[in-house]
Amino acid sequence: MFSLPTLTSDITVEVNSSATKTPFVRRPVEPVGKFFLQHAQRTLRNHTWSEFERIEAEKNVKTVDESNVDPDELLFDTELADEDLLTHDARDWKTADLYAAMGLSKLRFRATESQIIKAHRKQVVKYHPDKQSAAGGSLDQDGFFKIIQKAFETLTDSNKRAQYDSCDFVADVPPPKKGTDYDFYEAWGPVFEAEARFSKKTPIPSLGNKDSSKKEVEQFYAFWHRFDSWRTFEFLDEDVPDDSSNRDHKRYIERKNKAARDKKKTADNARLVKLVERAVSEDPRIKMFKEEEKKEKERRKWEREAGARAEAEAKAKAEAEAKAKAESEAKANASAKADKKKAKEAAKAAKKKNKRAIRNSAKEADYFGDADKATTIDEQVGLIVDSLNDEELVSTADKIKANAAGAKEVLKESAKTIVDSGKLPSSLLSYFV
């Protein structure tokens, strides 16, 4: 029990015993926080402090271990990619998938030497015959362990690995099926990436995309048309017997292997040529470039022939103009008099037509809503027509033709001009003035 110390004599406390005390209030209180949770766990599981601390320490160690996982481990196969490897005849190890046996079926030719060593260590720990026997495994799996060892020997030797990679057809990516709809770049990109692993030359140009320039596309296909491949097929050779007593047979096997390799190499080169030719034929950029070249060729031809066309057109035009000029001059004098007469008659007819148009405008406009004044309107329109000169007559007629609904305003404007000029008094044009 905790008790407060007694007050010293120099401290006085005044207590108002008559003051009002606030009533008691019941409030819910709940335990929270990580320390309460730890207490609850210990209570529910009947753990002592030492047991609880040991369990927490193990959790912390596990968390640290998981955070320190080798990133290469994430690239290795978690399970055997091909279960048939477990029963594969070790004597026929060359036909086995060595990358799958090593747990590297996803990496294959991309696997580094360090990754191969790590993967081998992991497979040895898992498939060592002693461990398999202790776990009650089959003795047949000893053969698989021998395949693992052969795979390690092959993949850690640069020459042997190159020979195996040459025959690792699992890593090949087939081209898209003909006659199907597909995205050219998504389908062909992995194909060329897989083929590029055999290139002697670097860097290797990228397939690019729809925005690649003509130069980039041409460089890409030029590279593949002149592709220099190191791919060989020694790995598929028939084993040469180590028999010094029968050298003829040994040389026969060697010649047979060389002929088989040459045949496979020729077939592979032909396959690659056909593959590149098909890619060229289906590349949308090549089609676009050909269309552009065709248009450019036609344009250059048109420009090249432009001079000849212009010269021919100029010559024909000059001849036509000379002929027309001669005919015009020959007829000019003869027709001058007739033309003058026709012009006079035409002007007279036009004037008559304009007068008629002005006179009829009032009638066509239903006398502007004043049909009872039709006679007066007709008379005053006639006075306007007779008072206008030829130029004013044409202008007035054109305005009425352009805006028949505004004929009255046009006539008012003409009447005002006549009155202002003193040609007629306003009393004679009272309707419009």
UniProtKB/Swiss-Prot annotation:
User: Where is the J domain positioned along the sequence?
Assistant: 98-170
Query: Where is this chain's protein located in or outside the cell?
Result: Cytoplasm
* SMART domains from the UniProt entry: DnaJ
**GO molecular function of the protein, one example?**
Hsp70 protein binding
Region annotated Disordered, chain positions: 292-357
A GO cellular component annotation in the UniProt record: cytoplasm
Q: Which terms under GO biological process does the entry name?
A: 'de novo' cotranslational protein folding; intracellular signal transduction; protein folding; regulation of translational fidelity; ribosomal subunit export from nucleus; rRNA processing; translational frameshifting
Q: How does it assemble?
A: RAC is a heterodimer of the Hsp70/DnaK-type chaperone SSZ1 and the Hsp40/DnaJ-type chaperone ZUO1. RAC associates with ribosomes via ZUO1.
The protein's matches in PANTHER family, at most eight in alphabetical order, are given as: DNAJ HOMOLOG SUBFAMILY C MEMBER 2 (PTHR43999:SF1)
Q: What does this protein do?
A: Component of the ribosome-associated complex (RAC), a heterodimeric chaperone complex involved in regulation of accurate translation termination and in folding or maintaining nascent polypeptides in a folding-competent state. RAC stimulates the ATPase activity of the ribosome-associated pool of Hsp70-type chaperones SSB1/SSB2 that bind to the nascent polypeptide chain. ZUO1 can act as a J-protein for SSB1/SSB2 only when associated with SSZ1.
* Record's protein name: Zuotin
Q: What is the lineage of its organism?
A: Eukaryota, Fungi, Dikarya, Ascomycota, Saccharomycotina
Q: Which gene encodes it?
A: ZUO1
